[in-house]
């Protein structure tokens, strides 16, 4: 079992503190949902874990299996088994989907251990079929001209191909219709097992109808203020964040 620990994490952007002491433990074999209103620091948390240089960690630790990874670059964290599926994936012309994924899969392997072209194609075909993706997607430039739904499927395809220890899934349900949501959820559920853990960031309970979390954490004002099991997401759907905030004595303004 691998463990990702976030201890008293404070993160700022351009001098403004966004995370104000986050404590969280993620384990392989578990799926945790991070829920909360917009602007409470959910995406900042995933970016900080992955090492985005635009986010300054001013206090705290991020430990992967007991080792502090704060001084590691993004690519080094990825090679240790961290994966981030972004809400708005970048378009990268000049490199195809297939080229990108094979390079990523082989990045941390010795020459004798690199995946062969045959094995790569076999695995790629299998995972693309699972997600209902056309074969031509493999030869298109990375995310270039992709629709929002295609980009989200492509992020999950990368997840299935790379098989990381921990996936940070940042609002992968954003902008998806119900059919695309089911496909994306199917891909995430395919990964579930003792060697895989996920942190799913979402604003709504809808995604969790298809990916049942083991744990649910509620973020408000840069902190995790409440934790529970999947029933907590259902409670949020009924009461809203205002109801939770009132119960906890937290000041909360409804979004306009």
Swiss-Prot record:
Residues covered by the ABC transporter domain: 4-246
Q: Which InterPro entries match?
A: AAA+_ATPase, ABC_transporter-like_ATP-bd, ABC_transporter-like_CS, FeS-cluster_ATPase_SufC, P-loop_NTPase
Q: Which domain of life is it from?
A: Bacteria
This protein's UniProt keywords: ATP-binding, Cell membrane, Membrane, Nucleotide-binding, Transport
| GO molecular function (one) | ATP hydrolysis activity
- PANTHER family listed in its UniProt record: ABC TRANSPORTER I FAMILY MEMBER 6, CHLOROPLASTIC
Q: How does it sit in the membrane?
A: Peripheral membrane protein
Q: Which taxonomic lineage does the organism of this UniProt entry have? A: Bacteria, Bacillati, Bacillota, Bacilli, Lactobacillales
Origin organism is: Streptococcus pyogenes serotype M18 (strain MGAS8232)
> Which positions bind ATP?
36-43
- Write out the GO cellular component annotations: plasma membrane
- Its principal location? membrane
Subcellular compartments = Cell membrane
Q: What is this protein called?
A: Probable ABC transporter ATP-binding protein spyM18_0273
Under the heading Gene3D superfamilies, the entry gives: P-loop containing nucleotide triphosphate hydrolases
The record's comment on protein family reads:
Belongs to the ABC transporter superfamily. Ycf16 family.
């Amino acid at each position: 079992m691998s463990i990702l620990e976030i201890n008293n994490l404070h993160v700022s952007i351009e001098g403004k503190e966004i995370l104000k002491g986050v404590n969280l433990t993620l384990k392989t074999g578990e799926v945790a949902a991070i829920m909360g209103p917009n602007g409470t620091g959910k995406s900042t948390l995933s970016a900080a874990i992955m090492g985005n240089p635009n986010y300054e960690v001013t206090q705290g630790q991020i430990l992967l299996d007991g080792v502090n990874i704060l001084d590691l670059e993004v690519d080094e964290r990825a090679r240790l088994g961290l994966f981030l599926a972004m809400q708005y994936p970048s378009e990268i012309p000049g490199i195809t989907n297939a080229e990108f994924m094979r390079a990523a899969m082989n990045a941390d392997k010795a020459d004798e251990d690199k995946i062969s072209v045959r094995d790569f194609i076999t695995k790629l075909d299998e995972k693309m079929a699972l997600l209902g993706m056309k074969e031509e997607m493999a030869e298109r430039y990375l995310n270039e001209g992709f629709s929002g739904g295609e980009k989200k499927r492509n992020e999950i395809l990368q997840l299935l191909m790379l098989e990381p220890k921990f996936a940070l899934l940042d609002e992968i349900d954003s902008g998806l219709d119900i059919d695309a949501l089911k496909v994306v959820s199917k891909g995430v559920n395919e990964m579930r097992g003792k060697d895989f853990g996920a942190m799913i960031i979402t604003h709504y309970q809808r995604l969790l109808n298809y990916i049942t979390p083991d744990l649910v954490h509620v973020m408000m004002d840069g902190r995790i203020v409440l934790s529970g099991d999947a029933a907590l997401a259902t409670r949020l759907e009924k009461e809203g964040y205002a109801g939770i905030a009132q119960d906890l004595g937290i000041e909360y303004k409804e979004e306009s």
